[in-house]
Amino acid sequence: MGNIFSPTHLIVILLIIIVLFGRGKVSELMGDVAKGIKAFKKNMKDEEDILEDKLERAHHSETVDVEPQKFQSLSVKRATTRVKGSSSSRKGKTSVVKKQRVK
């Protein structure tokens, strides 16, 4: 008598619920609970998939970003050496700058 959740007490409580609400309502309620559990599991799986995709993209973007920076620094070095070699006087550069300001 001390244990409220004994099997006999649970059966009596279940019978009272069935009598009060009817079999149709109880089965409908249990169906709704099952749908809720399925939706919850589906959403949890979707969230895990989204997080895995974001992690994979972040890892992939980190490896891709490193290589263009190396190529960019090489092209900048080549461009600066070409500019230094092609310029013969400073007066030519200043006249170009003055023309751009006039426009």
From Swiss-Prot:
Residues 90-103 have a biased composition (Basic residues). GO terms for cellular component: TAT protein transport complex. Keywords: Cell inner membrane, Cell membrane, Membrane, Protein transport, Translocation, Transmembrane, Transmembrane helix, Transport. It comes from the Bacteria. The keyword Cell membrane applies. Belongs to the TatA/E family. PANTHER family: SEC-INDEPENDENT PROTEIN TRANSLOCASE PROTEIN TATA (PTHR42982:SF1). The Tat system comprises two distinct complexes: a TatABC complex, containing multiple copies of TatA, TatB and TatC subunits, and a separate TatA complex, containing only TatA subunits. Substrates initially bind to the TatABC complex, which probably triggers association of the separate TatA complex to form the active translocon. This is Sec-independent protein translocase protein TatA. It comes from Bartonella henselae (strain ATCC 49882 / DSM 28221 / CCUG 30454 / Houston 1) (Rochalimaea henselae).
